[in-house]
Amino acid sequence: MARYLGADCKLCRREKMKLFLKGSKCESPKCPIEERPYPPGEHGRTRAKESEYLLQLREKQKCARIYGVLEKQFRRYYEEASRKTGRTGENLLRILESRLDNVVYRAGFAASRDQARQLVRHGHFLVNGRRVDIPSYRVSENDVIEVAEKSRELTPFVIARAVAGERTVPPWLEVIPNRLRILVHSLPSRQVIDTPVQEQLIVEFYSK
């Protein structure tokens, strides 16, 4: 599956905010946006006032970058969200949150969504007892996700056990650190999704 291969820190500077794409580096003084809080490029410091369309485009791109999803798949998610009952923007965020790589990240088993994607691809997770190596796999209510027995002593999971409790886990998930297990109690409502996006701008972008 295609994925973005450029510099993650440039994406944060382009959006003028931390997207937390680099794990612990984003929390440190070494984060480039701390030293250069303006978009990359020769004219990054003097960016012109953005049009309504550009604001909508940037919000769509920001959301896709946060979750590590490229345009073709992101649009498919939007189209699926628009067919569901309820608010399209909230449906879209719920779909993105239900991706297996995001759940692994939210549970604290990976430092970033990118690392979570790699761990899933390498076959380190079971969902309801069956190995799943597709990062975009969508979890459902009452699913049980756990680290495969053969993978439990790998460094990311040793760290996950050691720092359990230091990271806030969203209320729709439950983590059992000593068993490296994640319980999906429900899919999230908008109120508990802390992704810093204005989803209505994304809806307006695709509605044109």
UniProtKB/Swiss-Prot annotation:
Disulfide bonds: none annotated. The keyword Ribonucleoprotein applies. Keywords: Ribonucleoprotein, Ribosomal protein, RNA-binding, rRNA-binding. One of its GO terms (molecular function) is structural constituent of ribosome. The keyword Calcium does not apply. GO terms for biological process: ribosomal small subunit biogenesis; translation. It comes from the Bacteria. One of the primary rRNA binding proteins, it binds directly to 16S rRNA where it nucleates assembly of the body of the 30S subunit. With S5 and S12 plays an important role in translational accuracy. Belongs to the universal ribosomal protein uS4 family. This is Small ribosomal subunit protein uS4. It comes from Acidothermus cellulolyticus (strain ATCC 43068 / DSM 8971 / 11B).
